[in-house]
Amino acid sequence: SNLETETGVRVIAIRRAGDWLTDPDAETVLRGGDVALLRGSELGVTGVYEKLSGERYEPPEPPAESSADLERAMDSVVLMKDVSELAVDLAYGAVLFDDDGLAEEVLDLEAEVDALQSRFEAWTLRAAAEVDDPVSLRGLVHLAAATEVISDAALEISEGVLRGLDSHPVIREAVLESDEIIARYAVGEGSPLAGRTLGDVAVKTQTGMRVIAVRRGDESRAPTGKQTGWVVSPGPETKLDAGDVLIAKGTRTGAERMVELTA
């Protein structure tokens, strides 16, 4: 069965007898003894975890001591993590496919992380005055700093593309052998996607492409409380409008269908 379609949970990797299967697809068969890494909502993960392991899923306990500022700081770190992960994905895509557009998105994402880092620092300093043990926030600070380093590294990866440097022949050969691509698409005024959700149009079913991020053409439509014009890991309920930019992964054939759908 299609696990992601039915549950909203994606298996992002499988560890099997000391080896790793990264980015498994609908054809991948799970075996006894496999260790699957899952990504999805807590509700979805709970059901899939119990189905795979036969054991009850126990979500981690939230910290007993919290405040509004600490909640904002933690939300910022989570968003920084999501944005930096996306930046790394796009940076490799920019180099592999010599795609200026993807490299430009990495530049935008790196700036987003820098802005989030500044907000995170302000909220963490405020939170430190409200908790009994400010030293307990050290791990959060280290995580945010590491995430910012990752986004900087993503920009370094894509800088060659931004400067117009040619890809190495080995990279070009790797691209020819790979069936999966990553690309960006602007939603046009006449696109069937404009004014509708990803689920309404069944983008993945129609094209085989998975939309991994949306950059809002109008940043005032950013998700409430997210402080960014990006929607990372959008779901079926994510509404699109003309001017939005989609980042999607899939096959070359699917990419051609995506061009038609967004035009």
Predicted regions, residues:
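Cytosolic Rossmann-like ligand/nucleotide-binding regulatory domains
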Residues: 1-50, 194-253, 260
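Haloarchaeal acidic low-complexity proteome signature biased toward cell-envelope/secretome components but also
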Residues: 2, 7-9, 20-23, 28-32, ...
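Surface-exposed interaction/gating patches
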Residues: 85, 94, 101, 179-201, ...
